């Protein structure tokens, strides 16, 4: 049968109804497309609003071609009058199309009873016929509709309509338009004016030379559609195959699927694919779209899956994608490049002294004490900040001065003013640890301690009496060590020092031990873990740690290198969920202020990420175990994992520790045996908190409690030891147990004590950097980093944009920006609009802190962050709070300027502050102003507040 797609200049539904009722009018129908097939009947069609099984046109009436002579109108490119259609109407073929509308008999005395003739039925059901036509069919009356839907050129419209409307396929209009562009690579015909009449539009289509190419295009489109389906099916198969065999965490798996499709179907990749499958006029129809089969899948494998195959394999990841830079130092103790010559000393002091000796004070008392020290030593030593930062600097400094006060020339440290007790003088030659102690009612004191009684105050004398020095399992050995338990806190800082102590990280000191805050997020419904599961988890984590240590640093002997595990005590049975909080369990910013205006402890912060379970105990091993669960934790399982760096190896910058934690986070998900254990019970991604490796952050020490925020005076969730003995000490584990009880092995900045002798010790080394080549930033994982590479607009590098603002177009390729250049940019282009907004929209008591007579100092912290300080002689001062007027206002609020880029050369600057009070959300980042700074050759826009 022959199909004719037609249109009208008047309402098509009424015109069709006139044809059906054989009511002659002066209207015409305009044939647009014809699909010829030898037949006596011609079906006139309209486009349907809905398509079932990809049928997008349907007939509205049929005519006898012997009467109509359709070819005569097509050859003359003329419209068909309604009279010709009425004369040739084939009622036998047309009547079934509307039979469902004529179910109600119509009685008419004028027609001798029941109406049976078709035209009379249409007449009496005229409203139903019109409603049916309007609901089922699209009835455009203007060429502009066809142009806007199918294309603006002659070839685009004709070929798209022919394939999309007449061929039973599942392609969208956009897909067919792409096929047309690949088929007609050079010429798509003339542009059709949108103001053309329907007659002109019909004559253009009927006389178009592209009519001769319809059959070739249909064959090409079918082949191309088949090729596209095959390519996409292969991409689906590859993505699913990698997802099934890779051990990806749940969230990473979801992001991986999006990344994989964005990589395979990126714009540049599809343009290459179009060139591969473009129409070849010299090839046979069956040879079209057969070049380079599997193109998209092959490129996906090359650009992503092969990389992920290596990146998500532990051995390949550590060998190919992680690089470590270590600096070898001189072994001579008197050399300037030896650890001693470089001042790379760890904590001194005694852990088993005769008494507790040190400074204890709140933040207010600390500020007063540091002010006193500045007054006493101002002519000799540089002034200290009156905050925790100043205390950390004081306790880390190795600077000394000469004095004749004793009658002879001697040297003394500035710490002498902090701890003036003469007996402590020898202990002040080396750095001192700084701790935070959590007191009842959410109060905190800071401690700088030179001597303490660790073992005598913390452990019973007969603690190791029943610990065997023979071969024992880890589980049995752990159960032989019993610690006395306390639950009520004391208001005395000296007493509480041995119950709720946190070590404060000091970036001025080298790091000897890697302290990991490991919070394993449990799946919903997991409310209890068997003992075997917990210890197998620790053994698996130890295996991963040793694999990473051996790969990154060398000189690691897995059979003897110590890894110390501590687990947060389970909540009591009466607690339905993990009341102590969820991930990120012990770290906190530590610049606490007065007790009346201080921040929340870490528990409040932890609850943000808590995902409590509400189920019952689930078995995690295949063996049948009817004993009660060993661990009743819900939501998360908190571990502290501490291991020293290899012998004679230290880290000197917090970024190294954050990078190591990032590597470990990824490695934990790649160990096959460990993944098998973790997958049913947990979400192992990002279990290590990298935030604790910042200056002034603290982490709870092993054997210490947490304060219950609700009760105020009760302690809970003590960090208890789990002994995972290395193989070399399996026969005599007592020495390892003693090492895990030794405080010196559990601190960031203390050299390990009683480190087992190694067959071959390395020379003194400093870890300069650890870098993931694919994910150099600790803020983004592999998926996020790769996603940036396939986005439509790639963000310009910050160095490039800063250079453009400093030097114009000639400097946009600068390799690096110095701190001096960055300061100049901030002073000349960034700070003026920020200050203008401050003075216009903030209270005078806030803005006057940044205006004359105050002198501001801008201190770059990397390329994207600049600290704002006030100069006070040789000292620097911070600011009062920019948000509120607190009851005890202090100049301790840190202010920063963040710089970031977009896809253009515009530079975004944000002014933000960090206040340490509860009212300001306890050290949260508070953004005040964000402005967009256009390049130097563009006008400056107004600042907008955030």
From Swiss-Prot:
Enzyme kind, highest EC tier: transferase
Natural source organism: Human cytomegalovirus (strain Merlin)
A GO-annotated cellular component: host cell nucleus
Biased composition (Polar residues): 617-626
Principal subcellular localisation of the protein: host cell
Listed name of the protein: DNA primase
Family the entry assigns: Belongs to the herpesviridae DNA primase family.
Keywords per UniProt: DNA replication, Host nucleus, Host-virus interaction, Metal-binding, Transferase, Zinc, Zinc-finger
Spans annotated as Disordered: 596-626
Keyword Electron transport set for record: no
GO biological process entries: bidirectional double-stranded viral DNA replication; DNA replication
Start and end residues, zinc fingers (CHC2-type): 881-920
GO MF assignments: DNA-directed RNA polymerase activity; zinc ion binding
Gene designation per UniProt: UL70
Function: Essential component of the helicase/primase complex. Unwinds the DNA at the replication forks and generates single-stranded DNA for both leading and lagging strand synthesis. The primase initiates primer synthesis and thereby produces large amount of short RNA primers on the lagging strand that the polymerase elongates using dNTPs.
Record-linked InterPro entries: HSV_PRIM
Entry EC number(s): 2.7.7.-
Subunit structure: Associates with the helicase and the primase-associated factor to form the helicase-primase factor.
């Amino acid at each position: 049968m022959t199909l004719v797609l037609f249109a009208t200049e008047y309402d098509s539904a009424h015109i069709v109804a006139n044809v059906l009722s054989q009511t002659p009018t002066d209207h015409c129908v305009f044939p647009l497309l014809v699909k010829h097939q030898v037949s006596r009947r011609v079906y006139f069609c309209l486009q349907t609003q809905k398509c079932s099984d990809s049928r997008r046109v349907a007939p509205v009436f049929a005519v006898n071609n012997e009467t109509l002579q359709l070819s005569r109108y097509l050859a003359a490119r003329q419209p068909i009058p309604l009279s010709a259609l009425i004369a040739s109407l084939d009622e036998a073929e047309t009547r079934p199309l509307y039979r469902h509308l004529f179910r109600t008999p119509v009685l008419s005395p004028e027609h001798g009873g029941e109406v049976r003739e078709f035209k009379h039925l249409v007449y009496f059901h005229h409203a139903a016929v019109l409603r049916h036509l309007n609901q089922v069919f699209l009835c455009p009356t203007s060429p502009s509709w066809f142009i806007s839907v199918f294309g603006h050129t002659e070839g685009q419209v004709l070929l798209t309509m022919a394939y999309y409307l007449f061929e039973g396929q599942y392609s969208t209009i956009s897909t067919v338009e792409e096929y047309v562009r690949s088929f007609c690579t050079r010429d798509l015909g003339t542009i059709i004016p949108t103001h053309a009449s329907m007659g002109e539009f019909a004559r253009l289509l009927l006389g178009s030379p592209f009519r001769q190419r319809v059959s070739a295009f249909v064959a090409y489109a079918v082949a191309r559609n088949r090729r596209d389906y095959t390519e996409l099916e292969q991409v689906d198969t590859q993505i699913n195959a990698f997802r099934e065999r890779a051990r990806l965490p749940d969230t990473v798996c979801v992001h991986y699927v999006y990344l994989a499709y964005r990589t395979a179907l990126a714009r540049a990749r599809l343009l290459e694919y179009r060139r591969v499958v473009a129409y070849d006029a010299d090839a046979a129809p069956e040879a079209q779209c057969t070049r380079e089969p599997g193109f998209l899948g092959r490129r996906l494998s090359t650009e992503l899956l092969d990389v992920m195959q290596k990146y998500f394999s532990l051995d390949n990841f550590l060998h190919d994608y992680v690089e470590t830079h270590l600096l070898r130092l001189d072994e001579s103790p008197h050399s300037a490049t030896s650890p001693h010559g470089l001042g790379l000393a760890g904590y001194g002091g005694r852990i088993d002294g005769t008494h507790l000796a040190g400074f204890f004070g709140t933040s207010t008392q600390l500020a007063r004490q540091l002010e006193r020290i500045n007054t006493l030593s101002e002519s000799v030593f540089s002034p200290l900040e009156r905050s925790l930062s100043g205390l950390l600097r004081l306790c880390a400094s190795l600077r000394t001065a000469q004095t004749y006060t004793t009658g002879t020339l001697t040297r003394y440290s500035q710490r002498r003013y902090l701890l003036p007790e003469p007996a402590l003088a020898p202990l002040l030659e080396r750095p001192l640890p700084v701790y935070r102690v959590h007191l009842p009612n959410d109060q905190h004191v800071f401690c700088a301690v030179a001597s303490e009684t660790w073992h005598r105050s913390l452990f019973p004398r007969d603690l190791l009496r029943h610990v065997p020095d023979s071969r024992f399992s880890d589980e049995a050995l752990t159960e032989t060590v019993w610690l006395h338990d306390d639950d009520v806190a004391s208001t005395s800082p000296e007493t509480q020092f041995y119950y709720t102590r946190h070590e404060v990280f000091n970036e001025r000191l080298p790091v000897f031990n890697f302290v990991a805050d490991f919070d394993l997020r449990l799946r919903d419904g997991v409310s209890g873990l068997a003992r075997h599961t917990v210890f197998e988890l620790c053994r698996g984590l130890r295996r991963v740690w040793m694999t990473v240590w051996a790969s990154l640093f060398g000189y690691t002997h897995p059979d003897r290198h110590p890894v110390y595990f501590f687990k947060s005590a389970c909540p009591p049975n009466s607690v339905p969920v993990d009341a102590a909080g969820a991930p990120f369990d012990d770290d906190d910013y530590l610049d606490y202020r007065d007790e009346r205006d201080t921040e929340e402890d870490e528990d409040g912060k932890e609850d943000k990420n808590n995902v409590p379970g509400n189920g019952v105990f689930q078995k995690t091993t295949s063996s049948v175990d009817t004993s009660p669960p060993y661990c009743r934790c819900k939501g998360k399982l908190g571990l502290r994992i501490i291991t020293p760096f290899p012998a004679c190896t230290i880290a000197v910058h917090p970024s190294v520790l954050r990078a190591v934690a990032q590597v470990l986070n990824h490695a934990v998900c790649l160990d096959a045996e460990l993944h098998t254990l973790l997958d049913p019970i947990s979400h192992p991604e990002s279990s290590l908190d990298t935030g604790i490796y910042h200056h002034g952050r603290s982490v709870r020490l092993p054997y210490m409690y947490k304060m219950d925020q609700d009760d105020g005076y009760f302690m809970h969730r003590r960090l208890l030891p789990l002994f995972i003995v290395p193989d070399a000490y399996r026969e005599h584990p007592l020495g390892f147990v003693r090492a895990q009880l030794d405080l010196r092995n559990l601190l960031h900045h203390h050299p390990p004590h009683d480190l087992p002798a190694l067959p071959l010790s390395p020379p003194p080394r400093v870890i300069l950097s650890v870098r993931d080549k694919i994910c150099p930033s600790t803020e983004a994982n592999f998926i996020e980093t790769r996603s940036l590479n396939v986005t439509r607009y790639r963000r310009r590098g910050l160095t490039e944009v800063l250079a453009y603002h400093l030097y114009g177009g000639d400097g946009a390729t600068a390799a690096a920006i110095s701190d001096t250049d960055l300061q100049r940019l901030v002073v000349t282009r960034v700070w003026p609009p920020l200050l203008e907004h401050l003075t216009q929209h903030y209270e005078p008591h806030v803005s006057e802190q940044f205006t004359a007579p105050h002198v501001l100092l801008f201190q770059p912290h990397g390329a994207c962050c600049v600290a704002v300080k006030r100069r006070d002689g040789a000292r620097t001062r911070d600011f009062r709070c920019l948000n509120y007027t607190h009851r005890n206002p202090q100049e301790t609020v840190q202010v920063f300027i963040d710089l970031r880029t977009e896809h253009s050369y515009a530079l975004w600057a944000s002014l933000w502050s960090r206040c340490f009070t509860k009212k300001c959300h306890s050290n949260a980042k508070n953004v005040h102003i964000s402005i967009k700074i256009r390049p130097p050759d563009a006008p400056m826009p107004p600042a907008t507040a955030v």
